[in-house]
Regions:
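Non-catalytic helical/linker scaffolds that mediate oligomerization, partner binding
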Residues: 1-254
């Protein structure tokens, strides 16, 4: 599927976990509901190495298997909450994700050398957690292909985080939070507004974490982000066509 054929231009990363170990839920996320009730499904699966190597490998294999079975071109975003970088790097080289994330706390020198330790096809992402100082972020952006932005929406706006990341050829990813969907099927208007408003800063990739990995309504969470993204794109003057064309070309989307 090319970007010209998509109704939603933004790409969605859904983190896999116990909730998506239910194969039916995983398939619903991939296929955008039953018989594609909404526009597009999940583009990229987030997988945590720190959940255990066997667990992570099983989730990746199942996601790739279901994607291939349905002729869907999807990708893997590998992350970890662990501290053993040697094991994490070895696992990444074994399963070859398209994107591999590392926490900013590893330090700038780490990011300057990490590419030489990974397979050539793996793209590097710096994870910027909530509360991280925005000083010196540009140095990290310059070393990476992607940035996972978990900062407060006001900080993202005031500190021009999206522009700074893109100016350094580092594509920013927005971690959307919908805590109400951890309890029920209807997200709050306040959450919708904050996510939509933040996407208008220029994010072209949106990630979900707990909502899809542990939440009771994983597929519903993806559907909500899909709807918010579509509405947000209508308000943007230039819907990032060039970036998407490059992205789809890199991952060989059809």
């Amino acid at each position: 599927m090319t970007s010209n054929e998509r109704h939603r231009l933004s790409l969605i990363i859904a983190t896999l976990g116990p909730s998506t170990d239910n194969e039916k839920e995983l398939i619903t996320m991939l296929m955008a509901g039953i018989a594609r009730q909404w526009t597009e499904g999940v583009d990229i699966a987030g997988v945590l190495h720190s959940d255990g190597e066997e667990t992570a490998k099983n989730r990746i294999e199942l996601f790739r298997e279901q994607s291939k079975k349905r002729n869907l071109s999807t990708s893997i975003y590998l992350d970890t909450d662990g501290s053993d970088m040697d094991k994490y790097i070895a696992f990444g080289n074994e399963i070859s994700p398209e994107i591999m994330s590392f926490d900013i706390s590893n330090g700038l020198d780490f990011f300057k050398t990490i590419k030489s330790k990974l397979e050539d096809n793996i793209k590097i992402c710096v994870r910027v957690k909530l509360g991280t100082s925005t000083e010196g972020l540009d140095d990290f952006f310059r070393e990476c292909d992607y940035s996972m932005i978990e900062l407060d929406s006001k900080v993202i706006h005031d500190e021009k985080i999206v522009m700074r990341s893109k100016d350094n050829s580092c594509e920013p990813i927005y971690l959307a939070l919908m805590p109400t969907l951890m309890k029920g099927q209807v997200q709050s208007r306040e959450e919708n507004f904050e996510i939509g408003h933040t996407l208008e800063e220029g994010f072209d990739l949106i990630a979900l974490y707990q909502e899809t990995s542990h939440g009771p309504y994983a597929a519903r969470s993806v559907k909500c982000i899909d709807e918010i993204s579509v509405e947000s794109e209508k308000l943007r003057v230039n819907p990032f066509q060039d970036m998407l064309d490059k992205f789809f070309s890199f991952f060989k989307k059809k």
